Regions:
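Short glycine/acidic-rich loop motifs that flank beta-strands on beta-rich extracellular proteins
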Residues: 1-2, 13, 17-24, 43-52, ...
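Residue-level preference for beta-strand/loop junctions
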Residues: 4, 59, 165, 195-196, ...
Length: 235
């Protein structure tokens, strides 16, 4: 967008391929534009020009309750503009390569580091939304459920359902699974992987609403199923 004002809300946005993949792009000369309740999924393989959110200029933007996910290895957000006048919070930023934000020529691989420098996104998240599919952008992560903030004038979701007092992040109001465990990330893997056998550690995350006391982890090596791992505890 390259104009004075725009309201962008309640959208599913997916972009893939091998070239430039942009979700929402705010260009120069904008003022007061609002980006609210959008679900973005970038699957393009360009790790530099793949950006779920791009801000190249403008002032006084409001950016809230969005999911900016880059599953192609690029940036969740890219800023070439001063953020001091922005109202930016209650968003989810996710990148498979930990490229949460690019700002002032620095890549921030954690949301906490980006927030500490900018003073923005204090209530935002950095989790994989686990979209239902590449193009069906209903999230399935409990940390995005009821963790947004109400915004005047945007009281219904993309399908016309009424948003709650504490709305969900993204374009769609959703109900997470009751019992749902998932692998949040692999721990300590180097890139590229060294030759030979290596221990594999993963971080298991409760993505449902109930406390979990057990889970069975299925896994494969080169397409060959291995002995399932049984976990017990409290999560």
């Amino acid at each position: 967008m390259n104009g004075l004002y725009a309201l962008v809300y309640n959208n599913y946005i997916q972009s893939g391929g091998v070239g430039i993949s942009k979700g929402i792009s705010l260009q120069e000369n904008g003022s007061g534009s609002k980006v609210l309740f959008n679900s973005v999924n970038i699957t393009g393989t360009d790790v530099v020009n793949g950006q779920a959110l791009e801000v190249l200029g403008g002032t006084n933007y409001t950016i809230k309750n969005n999911i900016f996910a880059n599953n192609g290895g690029g940036y969740a957000s890219y800023f070439a503009s001063d953020l001091s006048s922005f109202a930016m919070d209650y968003n989810d930023y996710f990148s498979t390569k930990r490229k949460i934000a690019f700002y002032n020529n620095i890549n921030y691989d954690t949301l906490s580091a980006f927030s500490a420098v900018t003073g923005k996104d204090a209530n935002s998240k950095s989790v994989n939304p686990y979209y239902t599919s590449v193009t069906n952008l209903i999230p399935n992560h409990t940390l995005l459920n009821r963790t947004g903030i109400a915004v005047t004038g945007t009281t219904t979701d993309i399908d016309g359902a009424t948003r709650g007092v504490n709305p969900d992040m993204g374009a769609k109001e959703f109900s997470p699974c009751v019992n749902d465990a998932g692998v949040n990330e692999f721990w300590g893997l180097s890139n590229p992987l060294p030759v030979g056998s290596q221990p594999i550690k993963v971080i298991l995350q409760n993505q449902g609403t109930n406390t979990l006391t057990s889970a069975t982890i299925q896994w494969e090596v080169n397409g060959v199923a291995q002995v399932p791992f049984s976990w017990t505890g409290s999560l």
